A protein has these predicted regions:
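Bacterial N-terminal signal peptides that target proteins for export
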Residues: 1-8
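N-terminal leader/targeting segments and the immediate start of mature chains
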Residues: 5, 16-52, 64-65, 196-207
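Short, exposed beta-strand/loop patches in secreted or surface proteins that constitute
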Residues: 31, 56-61, 74-75, 120-126
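Short beta-strand segments that buttress and anchor functional surface loops
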Residues: 42-46, 67-71, 132-140, 161-165
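Short, surface-exposed coil-to-beta transition loops
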Residues: 52-56, 70-71, 78-79, 143-148, ...
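An acidic-aromatic
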Residues: 58-105, 169-172
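Flexible, surface-exposed loop/linker segments and immediately adjacent secondary-structure boundaries
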Residues: 97-130
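Non-transmembrane domains of secretory- and envelope-associated proteins
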Residues: 127-131, 139-145, 154-207
Length: 207
């Protein structure tokens, strides 16, 4: 799940880095990612040790916070703390966002702010109505290489897919079904309210 979060956020964050490098076609995406809340619907295939795992879900993110729902889990992060909810087993895990190099794994939204310092982004290659970006890491972040495809067929550029080679040898391919923007949500949206869970739930707090 962390690999899916990391790669999906890198996919979104590329618009910020590319626009900063002077890519005018992504300026509108950059502005939206910087000033609004982004809602993303995705499907993905994770290949690890020859085994393929299919998944799909939704991601809502702004600043250093996110909520991700998919593959039977709900994950909330307000930039400081992390709540992982497994509804089927009625378990909740609470932890602090890590510091240092591990911070990118416990709160991948940090990749958005540090994208230019973490990745080298090659010049985009345009094929038909699509633009492909290649990236390679400058430091450890869980990804060894990746590509992102953006469609410019319509009036506004949109993300369509991403393919990422993970540091542990896994391969993650993501298809973006939709990506929309809205006004920023209150920070409480990214915090799990524990008052709604009764004694039948197992809550583990590692903070």
């Amino acid at each position: 799940m962390k690999r899916i979060i990391i790669s999906t956020l890198v996919l979104c964050g590329l618009c910020i880095a590319a626009a900063a490098q002077g890519n005018a076609t992504l300026e509108q995406l950059r502005a939206n990612m910087s000033n609004k809340s982004a809602a993303i619907s995705y499907s993905c295939t994770l290949t690890s040790s020859g085994v393929k795992t299919l998944g799909e879900g939704t991601l809502t993110t702004q600043d250093k916070s996110y909520v991700m729902k998919g593959n039977g889990l709900r994950i909330y992060c307000n930039g400081t703390n992390l709540w992982v909810v497994d509804d089927s087993s009625k378990e909740i895990l609470i932890d602090s966002v890590s510091q240092g190099a591990d911070a990118y794994l416990s709160n991948p939204v940090l990749l958005l702010a540090d994208l230019n310092s973490i990745f080298t982004i090659a010049q985009p290659v345009k094929t038909g109505n699509s633009i492909v970006y290649k990236l390679s890491p400058k430091q450890s972040c869980g990804i060894s290489s990746g590509t992102v495809t953006i469609s410019v067929a319509g009036p506004n550029p949109v993300f369509t897919s991403g393919s990422f080679k993970m540091s542990d040898g896994g391969q993650l391919d993501i298809k973006i079904k939709s990506m929309t923007y809205s006004e920023k949500k209150p920070l409480t949206f990214y915090v799990l309210d524990l008052s709604g869970f009764d004694s039948s739930w197992m809550i583990t707090d590692l903070r």
